[in-house]
Amino acid sequence: MSRDALIVGLNTYTYLRKLNAPAEDAEAIARCLEQQGEFRVWRLPEAIENSKPRVGKTLHLTLPELQRALVQLFKPSERQIPDTALFYFSGHGIRYDAGIQEGYLATSDVNPDQGFCGLSLRWLRQLLKESPVRQQIIWLDCCHSGELLNFDEADPGDQGKGRDRCFIAASRASQVAYEEMGSAHSVLTKALLGGLDPKRLPDRWIDNLVLTDFINQALRVCL
């Protein structure tokens, strides 16, 4: 079974407050997927340290770069379609109201005062609908990421060929994601890493249902 993952962690923004946790959170997820999930992982923004790739703490990522990477992940044209495609994003989320409220994943080049907010979650939903990848996993660790949970999982253009989609978000659309004081990771990423730990269930395969149940319980304790 082939598994591909795009892992994004953005600390650095031109017009928004810089963040501390996303790059470290993303790198921890990337290593976990590589070492325990047998995923082929792409990191953004990518830095090379000691001849190895890692999520860059001070690097920028533009909207076109993120869009190209997502299209390559979910609609690959020059390589075999993976059985599973996973997208993890940690960074700022934006809800912008220009007569119609819409949610965005903020890339480093966003400027909300000028109406430029980053990757539209509606665009992402449409990409997932059109994707031939059978198992699609999206983990969003940002404020307002709950906007994506309005996604209509039924794909009317592909009846009879169901998709297995799993969405895990750090917050509801009206809430702000937060970091747990004294922890090396955000609340959601800490729960993800805990749920993916093979030592927790040594005799059981960790699938989406098992992981989601663990995260729901972990977040309930934190609230």
Residue ranges of model-derived segments:
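Functional beta-strand-loop-alpha-helix junction segments that form "active/interaction loops"
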Residues: 26, 31-83
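Short, conserved active-site loop motifs that form the nucleotide-linked donor/cofactor pocket
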Residues: 3, 39, 165
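Active-site-proximal beta-strand/loop segments in catalytic clefts of secreted hydrolases
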Residues: 8-11, 44-48, 88-92, 108, ...
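Short glycine/proline-enriched loop/turn "hinge" motifs that connect secondary-structure elements
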Residues: 1, 34-35, 95-99, 158-161
